[in-house]
């Protein structure tokens, strides 16, 4: 027995709510994945601020209809799709999906959408290869710390150099 019109409307509203909170959407071909494997993917995504939603393409089409941010997904809505919606740390969620795909060798990323731009598989891999936000902040902090250290050494070196020059000049004057 199929879903009622009311339950379909609820699903569309739920998807709209999830999309409103999401920063990125990935479309995966999940054909051939077992329930256990889908559960594994979902648990990996929970740890990295992502959610995996399996729904009919027609319901997703209704959810993105009229929404300029997500309308680019329209071209990916064919076949058996699972939708990964990511809020926050996009890189860690992409790494979780890629690690899952590498282990199972059953799922394939069709594409994605980030900030209204349709992404290819290569672009998604490039984003996943970027360091996490925490790693970037640590690199910036390290760079700033080294700059301040160099400035402090340089500022300290000026009076020391002057003192050495004066001492040498005084020794030369005495001779």
Swiss-Prot record:
Subunit structure, interactors included: Part of the ribosomal stalk of the 50S ribosomal subunit. The N-terminus interacts with L11 and the large rRNA to form the base of the stalk. The C-terminus forms an elongated spine to which L12 dimers bind in a sequential fashion forming a multimeric L10(L12)X complex.
Task: Provide the function of this protein.
Answer: Forms part of the ribosomal stalk, playing a central role in the interaction of the ribosome with GTP-bound translation factors.
Q: Which domain of life is it from?
A: Bacteria
Q: Which organism is it from?
A: Prochlorococcus marinus (strain SARG / CCMP1375 / SS120)
Q: Name one Pfam family in it.
A: Ribosomal_L10
- One GO CC annotation, please? ribosome
Q: Extract the InterPro entries matched here.
A: Ribosomal_uL10, Ribosomal_uL10-like_sf, Ribosomal_uL10_bac, Ribosomal_uL10_bac_type
List the molecular function annotations (GO) for this entry.
large ribosomal subunit rRNA binding
The UniProt keyword set, sorted, is: Ribonucleoprotein, Ribosomal protein, RNA-binding, rRNA-binding
Q: Name its GO BP terms in alphabetical order.
A: translation
Listed name of the protein:
Large ribosomal subunit protein uL10
Write out the similarity annotation.
Answer: Belongs to the universal ribosomal protein uL10 family.
């Amino acid at each position: 027995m199929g879903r009622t019109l009311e339950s379909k409307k609820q699903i569309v509203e739920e998807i709209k709510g999830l999309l409103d909170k999401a920063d990125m959407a990935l479309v995966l071909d999940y054909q051939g994945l077992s329930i256990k494997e889908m559960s594994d993917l979902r648990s990996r995504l929970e740890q990295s601020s992502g959610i995996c939603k399996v729904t009919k393409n027609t319901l997703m089409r209704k959810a993105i209809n009229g929404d300029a941010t997500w309308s680019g997904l329209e071209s990916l809505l064919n076949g058996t799709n699972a939708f990964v919606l990511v809020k926050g740390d996009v890189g860690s969620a992409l790494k979780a999906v890629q690690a899952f795909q590498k282990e199972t060798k059953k799922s394939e990323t069709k594409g994605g959408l980030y900030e209204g731009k349709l992404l290819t598989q290569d672009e998604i891999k490039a984003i996943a290869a970027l360091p996490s936000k925490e790693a970037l902040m640590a690199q910036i902090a390290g760079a700033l710390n080294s700059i301040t250290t160099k400035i402090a050494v340089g500022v300290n070196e000026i009076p020391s150099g002057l003192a050495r020059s004066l001492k040498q000049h005084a020794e030369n004057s005495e001779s």
